[in-house]
Regions:
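Short, solvent-exposed, charged loop/turn and helix-capping segments
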Residues: 70-87
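N-terminal intrinsically disordered, cationic/polar leader segments
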Residues: 1-53, 83, 88-122, 126-143
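Short, Lys/Arg-enriched phosphate-binding patches
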Residues: 51, 58, 75
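Long, contiguous binding/interaction regions
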Residues: 66, 77, 95
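Alpha-helical segments in soluble extracytoplasmic regions
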Residues: 55-71
Length: 143
């Protein structure tokens, strides 16, 4: 027998940055997660404890997935068609960075994590040049 609750419960759960949209965007969110991936890889490599190393892999994979999430939100919600005029490679830059986050998720390669950080820095420069700190942060980006 169907209950009233089962009729009105969501058929799937969806996560989003907020999709109000609140208008708060910053590549720093992706960078913090990518830095975590790099540090976790370093800690993993320095440890002989198999249980700790397994935890490192699990948490690093979660952090790398969050990098992808934060990049996707920034790419799809902040950047607009007019930004393509200044940055015709914008889509390719984000696509490659998201693919790089997948590489970090799949491996324990510190070099891959460093490359991801470099890609996020490039995205950060695009964000800054398009007015990101002033347009999307309450009082600009904290220094």
């Amino acid at each position: 027998m169907l209950t009233l609750h089962s009729l009105f419960r969501p058929t799937r759960i969806v996560d989003a940055h907020c999709d109000i949209p609140c208008g708060v965007y910053d590549p720093e969110q992706a960078r913090i997660e990518a830095e975590s991936c790099l540090r976790i890889i370093e800690k993993h490599d320095a440890s002989d404890d198999k249980h700790f190393r397994a935890r490192c892999v699990h948490v690093k994979e979660e952090r790398a997935e969050l990098v992808k999430h934060h990049l996707d939100v920034l790419w799809h919600d902040y950047f607009k068609p007019e930004h393509l005029e200044k940055y015709p490679d914008l889509h390719d830059t984000f696509w490659k960075a998201t693919k790089q986050a997948s590489k970090v998720k799949q491996s324990l390669d510190a070099g891959a994590a460093k490359e991801l950080l470099s890609m996020i820095d490039t995205i950060d420069e695009m964000w800054k040049a398009t007015g990101g700190p002033d347009k999307t942060r309450v009082n600009g980006r904290p220094s």
